Regions:
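N-terminal signal peptide
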Residues: 2, 17-33
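Substrate-binding surface in catalytic domains of secreted glycosidases
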Residues: 76-85, 142-294
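A structural motif corresponding to the C-terminal end of an alpha-helix
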Residues: 90-101, 131-133, 162-166, 189, ...
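Conserved, mostly hydrophobic/aromatic
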Residues: 66, 103, 139, 193, ...
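Glycan-recognition patch characteristic of GH18 chitinases/ENGases
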Residues: 27-129, 209-211, 230, 273-279, ...
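Glycan-binding loop/region signatures in secreted carbohydrate-active enzymes
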Residues: 62, 204, 210-213, 247-342, ...
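Classical eukaryotic N-terminal signal peptides for Sec-dependent ER targeting/secretion
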Residues: 1-17
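Active-site groove signature of glycoside hydrolases
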Residues: 124-152, 199, 350
């Protein structure tokens, strides 16, 4: 795998040797011997996939919180609950392990911010949570951008907090930490903010970017495609200017992207020169670690390389033909979580999404997250 991989592995071992000293100082106030949050996003639809991933597959002993995704709502604040969403065994098994389960609401806010019906949404959520034994709410609004949006976000989080003082209340924010999130005002209402430090790669880029760099690589010819906050280090700095460390969770992806028409890291997609938006568009598609990438690591015509600055892997074709994959493995996941928890002293980490690490038998990335959060060796 080359000298870069060897250097990466050596650094992991050196770091792990130091972790026991720092972890010994941590006092566990969370389940499963953890003093840092490990939050897992879980989409109800994953139990219909092959292999299925549902309540029976979740390793509750490696988590502190679960965000249960799938419910939507409209401009009147009415909830839409899809068939198969309600899983009593999810909540009961999580609670038996001391793990909190939260409703993940958001994506598109469907005009709620201008309809005047936010109290209706809050009331409907409170009724649903009481009926099905949920512990709180995670808001995933992609993305508030205006002063009006910011004021609405503060109002909504305030109403959720008034609705139930015991809620675990959080929201998801892009790594740039823009003013639309109103962090100085909203922090009084939320337990923590989940920083979505991923998707620096994807069809919206013109170059073969890294999905989630731990540190920014200055060799990137197009840093504007994911700036500001284009790395874990950069995003942490932005959010630490507005929030205390314990109120921040750093995101880590269990998925990546395949670029089909480039051969190297940071290459320009040839088709970007004639696409309407100047991006790679349909020359890029996403894949999960467990099903799409794990079995190709140094196999099936692919070779793994490591960016020695960003500290994340990527794959290229052995024969030099087109094909570039940006993803995370257990080394980079461990490093990202360790850096976030123990160097920047954040409150924890979270991932999108639990099922994307699953290969039908094991979850390498979740195990790495848990061990790094504990301060254990890999």
């Amino acid at each position: 795998m080359g000298s870069r991989c060897l250097s990466f592995r050596v650094s992991i071992l050196l770091v792990a040797a130091c972790l026991f000293l720092s972890s010994a100082l941590a006092q566990s106030a969370l389940p499963n011997h953890l003093s840092k949050r490990v939050v897992g996003d879980y989409g109800y639809w994953s139990k219909y996939q092959n292999p299925p991933y549902g309540a029976a597959q979740i390793p509750y002993n490696r988590l502190t919180h679960i965000n249960h995704a799938g419910i939507s709502f409209d401009a009147t604040g009415t909830l839409s609950v899809p068939d198969g969403f309600i899983e009593p065994e999810l909540n009961s098994q999580a609670h038996a392990a001391g793990v909190k389960v939260m409703l993940l609401l958001g994506g598109d806010f469907s005009g709620l911010e201008t309809s005047g019906q936010v109290q209706t949404l809050v009331d409907n959520v409170a009724t649903f949570e009481q009926q099905y034994a949920y512990d709180g709410v995670d808001i995933d609004w992609e993305y508030p951008s205006s002063d009006q949006d910011a004021a609405f976000l503060v109002q909504m989080m305030s109403l959720f907090r008034q609705s139930n003082a015991d809620y675990v209340l959080s929201f998801d924010a892009g790594p740039w930490g823009g003013s639309g999130y109103a962090l100085p005002q909203v922090k009084q209402y939320v337990d923590y903010v989940n920083v979505m430090m991923y998707d620096c790669a994807g069809p919206w880029t013109a170059h073969g970017q890294l999905n989630s760099s731990i540190f920014w690589d200055p060799r990137d010819p197009a840093p504007y495609e994911c700036q500001p906050g284009g790395s874990v280090a950069g995003a942490a700095t932005i959010f630490l200017q507005q929030l205390p460390p314990k109120q921040i969770n750093m995101g880590t992806p269990f998925y990546g992207y395949v670029y089909v028409n480039i051969k190297h890291l940071f290459d320009l997609c040839p088709n970007s020169q004639w696409t309407q938006d100047g991006e790679c568009d349909n020359a890029v598609f996403s894949g999960s670690y467990g099903l799409n990438f794990k079995h190709n690591i140094n196999r099936n015509g692919w070779r793994t390389h490591y960016d020695p600055i960003a500290l994340v892997p990527y794959m290229l074709r052995v024969d030099g033909t087109n094909g570039y994959i940006t993803y995370d493995d257990h080394y980079s996941t461990y490093m990202r979580v360790w850096y976030s928890d123990w160097v920047r002293h954040l409150g924890g980490t979270f991932m999108w999404a639990l099922d994307q690490d699953y290969d039908g038998h094991s979850q390498d990335l979740l195990r790495a997250m848990y061990n790094a959060s504990l301060g254990n060796a890999r």
